[in-house]
């Protein structure tokens, strides 16, 4: 098997991005044909993931390969989550619904076409369910790259937002497409993702 093949039995699991990932983050790259700003995703890992975590702006979770000693050797993909709000217009102004936002999601181009994107989405849903046990979360939100709209629509039935709704916007994703998923749509769906405790049989 190629070293660039996804294999959950080969010490590949999710963990929060931390200092031990900084060295391998420089080898992360996104296929330029998959989005409009591929350099952004590497830059985010190298320059912003740690600071966002420390300041409470967002938490980045990486799917990483590890050696036999548990040291990360490659980042297959990552997803960054942050608290957000689904804003909607009313006669008196704006109101909001509690939400979790996928502010970053990227797959290393060395590991494309192996289901990594779906694993990242499933992990985001798992986190959403865990948060919902102690806090209100009604929607999962994302600003999708135009090239990724079909992926979000078909994989988990995300919908484009109408003119009635908004997500707090950022400069870099001004050309992206705001999409939403009502959380209870997936209440009966059980995400499957690799963890450090998974054994070969479970994988």
Predicted regions and their residues:
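Non-catalytic substrate-recognition and accessory regions of acyl/acetyltransferase enzymes
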Residues: 1-114, 119-141, 145, 149-203
């Amino acid at each position: 098997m190629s070293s660039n093949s996804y294999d959950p039995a080969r010490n590949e699991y999710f963990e929060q991005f931390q200092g031990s990932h900084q060295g391998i983050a420089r080898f992360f790259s996104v296929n330029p044909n998959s989005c409009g700003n591929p350099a952004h995703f590497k830059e985010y890992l190298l320059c912003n993931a740690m600071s966002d975590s420390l300041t409470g702006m967002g938490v980045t979770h990486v799917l990483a390969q590890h050696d036999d000693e548990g040291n990360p050797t490659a980042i297959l993909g990552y997803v960054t989550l942050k608290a957000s709000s689904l804003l909607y217009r009313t006669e008196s102004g704006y109101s909001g619904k509690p939400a979790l936002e996928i502010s970053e999601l990227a797959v290393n181009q060395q590991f494309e076409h192996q289901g990594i994107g779906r694993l990242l989405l499933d992990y985001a849903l798992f986190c959403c369910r865990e948060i919902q046990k102690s806090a209100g979360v009604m929607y999962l939100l994302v600003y999708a790259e135009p090239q990724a709209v079909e992926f979000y629509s078909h994989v988990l039935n995300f919908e484009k937002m109408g003119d009635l709704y908004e997500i707090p916007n950022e400069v870099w994703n001004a050309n992206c497409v705001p999409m939403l998923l009502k959380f209870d749509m997936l209440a009966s769906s059980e995400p499957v993702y690799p963890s450090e405790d998974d054994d070969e049989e479970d994988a």
